[in-house]
Amino acid sequence: LNNAAITAQAFLDQGYRRVAILDVDYHHGNGTQSIFYERSDVLFVSLHGDPAIEFPFFLGYADETGAGAGEGYNLNLPLPAGSDWPVWSAALEQGCQAIDDYQPEVLIVSLGVDTFELDPISRFKLTSPDYLKMGERIRALNLPTLFVMEGGYAVEAIGINAVNVLEGFEQR
């Protein structure tokens, strides 16, 4: 099951007209992209490892922007191995600007903390304090927001990093 996609569709079924999904998991959200690729009622933004060297390999490239009615409503921000907070946060800023421009009524965050520097799967270099800043930036969108937990494989740090996102989000 794709919890972010199910939730987005549930919001639409309840009368919302514009939903944004921000996927910050290390791997591209290929399922979510495929579900909404030809639709304009959901903006999908994904920050992820470069699919030229990372799973899923066949989707997640920057030139995949949507099709048909969905053209322009899919934003992939693939990042190189070794991306740290300055690199990653620049992509987050680009994604947040696209979300702000789209003017959704609600935001769903596919929250993966497998971008952590000690995660055995990831090649990104985010630190635990970076997740506070991530939450703060997402909060600055000033949208009703639902977080859906995704990946994270540095077991001892998953809780710390997920809580840091939420604490950053709740700070005013």
What are these regions (language model features)?
Residues D119-S122, V155-I160:
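Metal-dependent catalytic neighborhoods of phosphoester/phosphodiester hydrolases
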Residues T127-S128, A157-R172:
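Short, electropositive alpha-helical surface patch
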Residues W85, A154-V155:
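Alpha-helix N-cap/loop-to-helix initiation residues
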Residues A140-T145:
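A short helix->loop->beta-strand "cap" motif at the edges of active sites that frequently abuts
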Residues L1-R137, L166-E167:
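Conserved alpha-helical scaffold segments that buttress catalytic/binding sites
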